[in-house]
A protein has these predicted regions:
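Generic detection of short hydrophobic beta-strand segments and adjacent strand-loop junctions
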Residues: 7-9, 129-133, 196
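Gly/serine-rich nucleotide phosphate-binding loop at the start of the catalytic core
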Residues: 1-72
């Protein structure tokens, strides 16, 4: 099985400059390849098969970064095309804007060019980078994704191939009803119902986030104070995201640990978000992310996850009747 482990990185200033260069080159190659594909199709009505290597002569700066990072940018573009042709509602591949797209790149482990030694991880082209490894893992490193968030912190997600652990069958079956007033109401086969409220810390953090947003809006554009206020706001939102992830991971772990069969309703967040009165509340509760976590954790642990039809009136039927 494949499992990802995410850790904080503490690069030097030289390494930060290299990462910034990688982020930019990956974005450049993705956009250039997408643009050339579009123009070629307009002229010939055929798909262009282009690769990052053919751009290195025209743009020599691409030779300064990890070639595997550029190859993965190509794979991401090809995947975006496949998703579009498979389901048009996904949308045509978009160009990546510098300040809106995620600053990240992915590289692969080839011949042991990625390894961990003495609290540092060795990466292609840049060497050893200091890493805070808060937990150990076993298995073969397949790839790594380097990223930088809005507050300027660096992270690495290490994809590892390892043997799947043997989980014992759980005792119960459970149904999950998602909501807004309460995040979820669960009922198991023993008739035990539990309400899980949205964590109060989120509301407190969101108030501080709104205050930081107002402070940013009052700063003069282009000033250093505005840059400082933007960093403060980014850190506030980062804290909110981390609190939400912690809540979702804790709850999804509890449910998949204790139950062999899990039934959850499939809600179309995209359609529900069209209701402007509910849009923010629905966005805050993160139903999709919770369902995603349940799905992969259920697969890891040998549980059965059943997604009930979204038109089934689960919210209108009591646990005794349904």
């Amino acid at each position: 099985m494949l499992k990802a482990y995410k850790f904080r990185l503490y690069p030097t200033e030289i390494q930060k400059a290299y990462f910034a260069n990688c982020f930019g080159c990956v974005r450049f190659v993705y956009n250039r390849m997408l643009n050339d594909k579009i123009e070629h199709y307009k002229e010939t009505r055929q798909m262009l098969k282009n690769t990052p290597a053919q751009y290195k002569h025209e743009f020599p700066f691409l030779k300064d970064v990890d070639s595997l990072a550029l190859a993965n940018a190509q794979q991401n573009l090809e995947k975006a095309y496949k998703n579009f042709f498979r389901d048009k509602s996904v949308g045509f591949p978009n160009f990546k804007a510098k300040h809106k797209s995620k600053a990240s790149y992915t590289t692969n482990n080839q011949g042991g060019n990625i390894r961990i030694e003495n609290g540092k991880i060795k990466l292609p082209k840049i060497g050893f980078v200091k890493m805070k490894q808060h937990r150990d893992f076993e298995g073969l490193i397949k790839s790594c994704t380097l990223s930088m968030n809005k507050s300027g912190n660096y992270f690495i997600s290490i994809l590892v191939e390892q043997e799947a652990p043997q989980w014992l069958p759980a005792e119960h079956k459970i149904g999950i009803d998602l909501g807004i007033a309460d995040f979820a109401i669960t009922t198991n086969d023993a008739g035990e119902s539990v309400k899980y409220a949205n964590p109060k810390c989120l509301y407190q953090s969101e108030k501080k986030g709104k205050k930081a947003q107002r402070a940013l809006s009052r700063k003069q554009k282009g000033s250093k104070n505005r840059d400082k206020a933007r960093l403060v706001l980014a850190k506030k939102y980062e804290k909110i995201a981390n609190q939400r992830k912690h809540f979702l991971h804790k709850l999804s772990n509890k449910i998949t640990d204790e139950n062999q069969v899990i039934v959850i309703e499939t809600l179309s967040s995209r359609n529900l978000m069209k209701n402007h009165k509910l849009a923010k509340a629905i966005g805050d509760v993160s139903w999709f992310e919770f369902s995603r976590q349940l799905a992969y954790k259920a697969e890891w642990k040998g549980r059965t996850l059943i997604k009930a039809d979204r038109f089934y009136p689960s919210s209108q039927i009591c646990s005794a009747c349904g």
